[in-house]
Amino acid sequence: MPNQHTLLLFNLLPVGSNISTWWNFGSMLLTCSALQVMTGFFLAIHYTANINLAFSSIVHITRDVPYGWIMQNLHAIGASMFFICIYIHIARGLYYGSYLNKNVWLSGTTLLIILMATAFFGYVLPWGQMSFWAATVITNLLTAVPYIGTALTTWLWGGFSINDPTLTRFFALHFILPFAIISMSSIHIMLLHTEGSSNPLGTNSDIDKIPFHPYHSHKDILMLTIMITTMFTIMSFSPDIFNDPENFSKANPLVTPQHIKPEWYFLFAYGILRSIPNKLGGTVALVLSVAILMTMPFTHTSYIRSMAFRPIMQLVFWTLIATFITITWAATKPVEPPFTIIGQTTSFLYFSFFIMNPLVGWLENKISFHS
């Protein structure tokens, strides 16, 4: 045993033989995480967390630092890839009932919240127009907290408006939170491996397991190759595809952009926020849009784990996916008809999924098992 090749030690990890490509996104997320830490480290070496120098330091990285443009673009595109993978990973969990493994699901949802915070802080760092105004709008939501809201906001800003102390602390937070992500990921993976992966059938895999290596290791490598190739292709041909044109202008507190909007991966939550015409209500809905995922293990009523054998729930699930895409699209549009009503309808449908989950489960049990 002591002389065994490291990969061969994965022979000790038995995995269900029928897990599909949807189970590959965990390893892809791990790779994204490693890539973000590496590129982020090289960017942090040259970045200056000062409101007068931050924007120039990004320009300096892109133009003057050897291969700085690769680091900067990979870090930006890597963030989008991270979110694409995590949303697919969550959708897989919802579809195949992976959330019934409570500890794994709750640690994963916590990971998502930390990741979203990290990405938000990172978006502020270039100190472009959209960075500044997105930070202003989102941090301002804290004032909606009863009694302590104003004090909380002033404390977060480090002053009475977004200024140099805010940028400095956001850089510090953006630097330290990835370590929290790495720690939580380790916990997430350890909790997963106490019970093992679920599978598309939602059955117990114990009767039919194969070694992780070479079968699943090669399967993972294929998807990783596709992901990295996609990233480098985007970086080479259209590196600014995910960027907002406003963010190429330095932050100016005196000029408000026409449409303040966050990066695409926050648009669904932003769409829900702005579909409620009340500050506190919108803030609560914004937090709930992610936190509501935590209710899934406790509202599962069906006798069947996977949606593969639940046609009514499949309809509800694909409605959720369509809703998610529609909110994302509607949130890029100005606040005027018909976009306001589209945003409100899709927000209602988004939350309806989590209410329908126990009801449809109960209905399916009635149809399938009590006829």
UniProtKB/Swiss-Prot annotation:
Keywords: Electron transport, Heme, Iron, Membrane, Metal-binding, Mitochondrion, Mitochondrion inner membrane, Respiratory chain, Transmembrane, Transmembrane helix, Transport, Ubiquinone. GO terms for biological process: mitochondrial electron transport, ubiquinol to cytochrome c. It is a multi-pass membrane protein. SUPFAM superfamilies: a domain/subunit of cytochrome bc1 complex (Ubiquinol-cytochrome c reductase), Transmembrane di-heme cytochromes. It comes from Coluber constrictor (Eastern racer). One of its GO terms (molecular function) is ubiquinol-cytochrome-c reductase activity. InterPro entries: Cyt_b/b6_C (IPR005798), Cyt_b/b6_C_sf (IPR036150), Cyt_b/b6_N (IPR005797), Cytb/b6-like_sf (IPR027387), Cytochrome_b (IPR030689), Cytochrome_b_C_euk/bac (IPR048260), Cytochrome_b_N_euk/bac (IPR048259), Di-haem_cyt_TM (IPR016174). A ubiquinone binds at residue 193. This is Cytochrome b. Heme 1 (or BL or b562) is low-potential and absorbs at about 562 nm, and heme 2 (or BH or b566) is high-potential and absorbs at about 566 nm. Heme b b566 binds at residues 89, 188. The chain crosses the membrane at residues 25-45, 69-90, 105-125, 170-190, 218-238, 280-300, 312-332, 339-358. It comes from the Eukaryota. Component of the ubiquinol-cytochrome c reductase complex (complex III or cytochrome b-c1 complex) that is part of the mitochondrial respiratory chain. The b-c1 complex mediates electron transfer from ubiquinol to cytochrome c. Contributes to the generation of a proton gradient across the mitochondrial membrane that is then used for ATP synthesis. Heme b b562 binds at residues 75, 174. One of its GO terms (cellular component) is respiratory chain complex III. Belongs to the cytochrome b family. It is found in: Mitochondrion inner membrane. Binds 2 heme b groups non-covalently. Pfam families: Cytochrom_B_C (PF00032), Cytochrome_B (PF00033). Its cofactor is heme b. The gene is MT-CYB. The cytochrome bc1 complex contains 3 respiratory subunits (MT-CYB, CYC1 and UQCRFS1), 2 core proteins (UQCRC1 and UQCRC2) and probably 6 low-molecular weight proteins. Its main location: mitochondrion.
